[in-house]
Amino acid sequence: MARRRVHQSTPENERAILDAALSLAVTAGYEGTTMSEVARLSGLPNGSIYYHFENKEKLFAELIEFCFEIWKKDHTGPTNRDLLRRSIAGSAGGSADPENKAEAFWVLALMFALDRRLEDNLARKKYLEVRKEMFEHMVRRVEPLIPAEVLAEDPEFGRKMVVLGRALTDGFYIAACAGDDVDFAEFADLSATAVEALIARRAEQLSKEKNS
């Protein structure tokens, strides 16, 4: 009687699977990434892949969480300009290079939001959940950088700035994916200047109203 093969769950094996899936995803996309190819690239047997991740949807859901943890560590900075530079020049601009896997993956993840055919897909649901967490993370980073009097007058002002910043970043992800001839560093600075001007103008308006 053949012995049942036991697959050992280890952090090393799980990381190898996620690294392999990430490498495939940024070049082959969701549809083109298969569990068997993940097994081949990771050097692990097919059974080990399914032992860790029941199916491709669950694998991609975990991959999104994995990339989100990297994103949180990378998106830091003392000013709004630093944050936008990281989001636009670093993340969106960097996503054009498949070798920059953690950034390139977010182009694929954005497709989950755009493709309605995947409405019930677990990976899509995970991306939309993580997208909300990303938003709240940025709100927590941005609000302390806005003058207190502006937030007192409009408590949603910080969230509005994050909505604007995210819209800009999403647009630049598409530009990178399309291969547009864009100087991402230049446009990151232009975007930061625009956001800073909006904040400064609102603070100035409030100051004038107070002194009138």
Regions found by a protein language model. Name each.
Residues 20, 24, 94, 168-175, ...:
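Amphipathic alpha-helical interface segments
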Residues 72-80, 101-104, 121-148, 160-163, ...:
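Amphipathic alpha-helical packing segments from all-alpha helical-bundle domains
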Residues 65-71:
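Short, basic, alpha-helical segments at the C-terminal edge of helix-turn-helix-like DNA-binding modules
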Residues 100-125, 174:
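Amphipathic alpha-helical segments used for helix-helix packing
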Residues 12-16, 20-58, 62:
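Helix-turn-helix
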Residues 62, 73-105, 151-165, 188, ...:
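Hydrophobic alpha-helical connector segments
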Residues 90, 119-121, 132-162, 176, ...:
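Hydrophobic alpha-helical bundle segments that form small-molecule/ligand-binding pockets
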Residues 2-7, 13:
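Short Lys/Arg-rich basic patches
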